[in-house]
A protein has these predicted regions:
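Membrane-water interface segments that mark the loop-to-transmembrane alpha-helix transition
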Residues: 1-43, 52, 56-59, 65, ...
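Membrane-interface junctions at transmembrane-helix termini in multi-pass inner-membrane proteins
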Residues: 7-11, 67-91, 149, 153, ...
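Specific pore-lining/lateral-gate transmembrane helices of multi-pass inner-membrane transport
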Residues: 9-24, 205-319
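Alpha-helical transmembrane segments of multi-pass membrane proteins
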Residues: 28, 32-36, 49-74, 131-132, ...
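Interfacial/gating helices of multi-pass transporter permease domains
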Residues: 55-56, 123-129, 164-168, 172, ...
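Hydrophobic alpha-helical transmembrane segments
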Residues: 88-150, 321-325, 339-360, 400-404
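Interhelical loop/hinge segments that connect adjacent transmembrane helices in multipass membrane
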Residues: 112-129, 142-183, 226, 230-242, ...
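Membrane-proximal transmembrane or re-entrant/amphipathic helices at the cytosolic face
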Residues: 388-425
């Protein structure tokens, strides 16, 4: 719905209050329906997830997701109006509250048998305290951004506008569900495709190594949060295609730097982030996992063409193709290769989606990306990373030396863009 909000916010003939009210009422209605149905069938859902004794956790999770959904439109308004301070404030305060509550419930409270401020630690809740902290974080975030609902009015709901929005957004929503399949279904295949104890071990290893890839994921999410409103606000500019190409260059460069920086220092980073020494066997698949995350980011940047041209069904088709690839590879190869199959499935899926989106977009909504330069940067990044990983894994001097050479190459090759940025500042 955020994407739809940004898209229709650029149409000058649509009243802002009408747009906000239509989008907000749609999300509020869907959120409450989701919450009610989830609560009514909570036990059935818990049984389906094979956690029949954790219904309370599921209920907290339902409330958390609903509240997060309610916060999307006011958060989108802040992003659209160029209010990064208020937006980041809501995220930072929420994150700090979450961190404090986790430390309070898990670290401090168990040390005080008589409780703190009348609150006593209940060992039966256990990990449930993390869910409670998440719920509080969601409530705080909504409370901070909620003032943006000032433009909301039931009377301003426009059914015809709602139909246009839904026609644009439903493929995006289904594509989002397919994307969730691409990112999470591999754990389920590991769970059901391997013997129970082996599955538990491999899921632990696979989940642990994904922590390293979150460095790329966090950057991608931060980039998208900032850049998506700009894509829509500038799509009528005569030089917008040139700008989109430059932004892709910047995105790829930043991701290449993150990728190489992680890879040449992977050994000591893994020692700090993987935790359990049993998970160290999974370090071998980290290059694949991170490269898949990088290609997913490029795909999401490429996807702007079908959003700007109102061809959102293309995103649905590409996501379904990706989901089919994910399901096939995991189903066919996990019994023999375990999490290696999942890692390759993710890489092949995101590579395929990236390539399909590029060629489809070139035919329908041409944006002249600097493909040759991007391929050179990606190839050098992969080559440097693999050389360091395979031959100099614990020789940080050589690995980081290669990293610095790559940075020097980038600085020289991008000197014109760097000079423009420096002159502006």
């Amino acid at each position: 719905m955020e994407t739809s909000f940004f898209r229709f916010a650029q149409e000058g003939d649509i009243d802002k209050k009408t747009l906000v009210s239509t989008c907000a009422l749609s999300i509020l209605s869907a959120g409450f329906i989701y919450l009610i149905l989830g609560y009514v069938f909570r036990q059935d859902l818990a049984n389906a997830f094979e956690t029949p004794d954790q219904v309370n956790y599921l209920v907290i999770f339902l409330f958390m997701l609903s509240i997060d959904a309610f916060a999307t439109i006011p958060s989108a308004i802040l992003r659209l109006e160029g209010k990064p301070v208020q937006y980041m404030l809501s995220k930072v305060i929420g994150a700090l509250a979450y961190y404090f509550l986790v430390v309070f419930f898990i670290k401090w409270l168990p040390n005080y048998p008589n409780g703190i401020l009348g609150i006593k630690y209940d060992p039966e809740i256990g990990v449930g305290y993390v869910f409670i902290a998440n719920l509080v974080q969601s409530i705080i975030t909504l409370a901070i951004v909620g003032k943006e609902f000032v433009n909301f009015s039931f009377k301003k709901f426009d059914f015809n506008l709602w139909k246009r929005i839904m026609n644009y957004s439903w493929p995006v929503m289904i594509a989002g569900l397919a994307g969730i399949i691409n990112q999470t279904l591999d754990r389920q295949f590991l769970k059901f495709g391997l013997p129970k104890e082996e599955a538990k071990h491999q899921i632990g290893v696979y989940g642990a190594v994904y922590k390293i890839a979150t460095f790329i994921t966090v950057f991608r999410q931060a980039y998208q949060l900032g850049i998506e409103p700009y894509f829509f606000s500038s799509f009528k500019d005569k030089n917008n295609h040139k700008t989109y190409a430059v932004l892709m260059d910047v995105f790829v460069i930043c991701n290449c730097l993150i990728y190489i920086g992680l890879m040449v220092n992977l050994q000591w980073i893994a020692e700090r982030y993987l935790g359990n020494s049993q998970y160290f066997e999974g370090i071998e698949i980290i290059p694949l996992v991170m490269l898949g995350a990088l290609f997913l980011g490029i795909y999401l940047n490429l996807s702007i063409w079908y959003k700007l041209s109102d061809q959102t069904r293309v995103g649905l088709y590409i996501s379904l193709i990706g989901a089919a690839i994910t399901i096939f590879i995991n189903f066919a190869f996990i019994p023999k290769y375990g999490y290696w199959a999942s890692a390759f499935a993710a890489l092949i899926t995101y590579t395929s989606m990236m390539i399909i989106s590029y060629f489809w977009g070139r035919a329908q909504y041409p944006i002249h990306y600097n493909i040759k330069k991007i391929l050179i940067y990606l190839s050098l990044s992969i080559a440097i990373s693999l050389v360091s990983f395979l031959y100099f894994r614990e020789n940080y001097f050589i690995g980081n030396g290669l990293f610095l050479l790559f940075i020097a190459f980038l600085a020289y090759n991008e000197r014109t863009m760097i000079n423009k940025i420096l002159r502006k500042n």
